[in-house]
UniProtKB/Swiss-Prot annotation:
The lineage of its organism: Bacteria, Bacillati, Actinomycetota, Actinomycetes, Kitasatosporales. The gene is repSA. This is Replication initiator protein. NCBIfam families: rep_init_RepSA. InterPro entries: RepSA (IPR046828), RepSA_streptomyces (IPR048241). Keywords: DNA replication, Plasmid. Essential for pSAM2 replication. Pfam families: RepSA (PF20199). The keyword Flavoprotein does not apply. GO terms for biological process: DNA replication.
Length: 459
């Protein structure tokens, strides 16, 4: 329960929910959603009948549920909107990325991908002007040694000269810049192997999984796992000449090549711009187990999963679309971020096809925060389906339907959307349940770590 006092309306609603005769069932529904902040409400029914005899095998209706509704998880990936669903999304992303690094027989990804050349690369945005930072040595250019959580970190040293328009236009075109980078990367690999671009697919494929991250200054950069496979994907071995060193060298060359650029035409008072990656490029080999010099599979997967649930909120912007600039006042948006949002508003009529104002809450970025090439790994959809199939199998076993042939059972259903979210009192109770679930997860993780440590000592 929260430490602060509840207002009378919330307290009264909380007591109403907690004292209801069907509270236990309501709590069970909330736990099944992961105690999400914004559950989806459905009304309706489902009916299982024997096709031959017409016998009713099972009948379910939401009429018997609390409030006459069934509550489901909202599925929002953003931690700022629904920590519970974001936790599930992060877990799926972790398994997706790690399967592409270590293999997963359940997903038809062989463990031999561990022997393929793999690197973890970070491509950053160029500079749009000096900002307050915290260098490893010395002080910021403003003369201050900023604290790690200083609010001014990432803000422009001189807002009058900072290129806010360039920053949001870069974010807006970052997806295209990534596409050109991957195209150039294949050409660089082919050149180092003495092959033409058309000959390369007969010998090798480039696979990747990536995630976008906003720096405090509001500029986007990409973290990517890049892997070299044989011509048929992860099931085939890449040629002997395809090494980690060759891949790393090709990445650096592709990022720096003039082809890897995106041009934006001039419009009214805005000059023509050509965007390229920043000079801070990091390429690190990925190893199965760490020896202190390379990044490990688990570390990479955890890092990517962490940022898959975030957007631009770490800059202080909103986590939803902005209707009017006045909304920024109500949410105490920092000045630097506000100027980036205002730049989106100002540039929108100059570049209408880029829909900058519609994506102002993302500081201009309009792509997917996490994405992958087709053959890198499994898909998020496949992971969700596996979870749904598991739950369906549990239900069938509980209802004694698993002994019947699927084609002998007729399933009828009718579902209607009935709203979303919690009442004030439900929100407080759900938040308490969510904290308990999170504590249980943390306790379980600590227990697993202790067990692994003990097994390591015993070995």
């Amino acid at each position: 329960m929260p430490d602060t006092l509840l207002d009378p309306t919330t307290l009264g609603d909380l007591l109403r929910v907690a004292s209801a005769p069907d509270y236990a069932r309501w709590e069970d529904q909330i736990r099944r959603t992961g105690a999400g902040a914004n559950p989806i409400h459905l009304t309706g029914w489902t009916l299982h009948k024997d096709k031959t005899t017409g016998e009713t095998l099972h009948h379910y209706t939401t009429a018997v549920e609390p409030g006459g509704r069934l509550r489901l998880a909202c599925g929002n990936r953003r931690a700022s909107r629904c920590p519970s669903c974001a936790w599930t999304y992060a877990g799926d992303t972790y398994h997706l990325i790690r399967a592409g690094l270590a293999g997963d027989d359940r997903r038809d990804i062989p463990a031999t991908v561990r022997d393929h050349p793999r690197v973890f690369a970070t491509l950053t945005a160029p500079s749009f002007g000096p900002v307050h930072n915290r260098p490893d040595h010395g002080t910021c250019r403003c003369g201050t040694r900023h604290a790690p959580d200083a609010p001014e970190l990432g803000a422009a040293l001189d807002p009058t000269t900072y290129d806010y328009a360039g920053a949001v236009l870069f974010n807006n075109h970052a997806g295209q810049l990534w596409q050109r980078f991957t195209t150039r990367l294949r050409r660089e690999i082919a050149a180092r192997a003495g092959l033409s671009r058309r000959e390369l697919p007969d010998c090798l494929r480039v696979s990747y999984g990536k995630v976008a991250e906003f720096q405090k200054r509001g500029a986007l950069h990409f973290h990517a796992v890049i892997r070299l496979d044989g011509p048929e994907g992860p099931d085939t071995t890449p040629p002997a000449w395809a090494t980690v060193a060759l891949l790393a060298d090709a990445i650096r060359a592709a990022a720096a090549h003039s082809y890897t650029s995106v041009s934006v035409p001039a419009a009214e008072d805005q000059p023509a711009r050509t965007f390229r990656w920043g000079t801070q490029l990091d390429v690190r080999p990925v190893k199965a187990f760490g020896d202190g010099s390379d990044i490990t599979e688990q570390a990479v997967a955890s890092y990517v999963a962490k940022y898959a649930t975030k957007a631009a909120e770490n800059t202080g912007t909103l986590d939803r679309r902005i209707g009017e600039l006045s909304e920024l006042d109500r949410h105490d948006v920092p000045d630097h971020t506000r100027r980036l949002v205002e730049a989106c508003k100002m540039l929108d009529p100059l570049y209408p096809e880029r829909r900058l104002w519609a994506w102002a809450h993302m500081l201009g970025f309009r792509g997917h925060f996490s994405s992958k090439s087709r053959r890198y790994s499994t898909t998020l959809g496949a992971l969700r389906q596996a979870r749904a199939d598991y739950r369906a199998a549990q239900e069938h076993a509980a209802l004694a339907l698993d002994d019947r042939e699927p084609d002998t059972v007729l399933v009828l259903a009718d579902w209607q959307y009935a709203g979303h979210g919690h009442t004030p009192g439900e929100s407080v109770l759900a938040a308490t349940i969510a904290r308990n679930l999170q504590l249980n997860r943390e306790t379980a993780r600590e227990a697993v770590r202790d067990q692994l440590d003990q097994e390591g000592v015993a070995a």
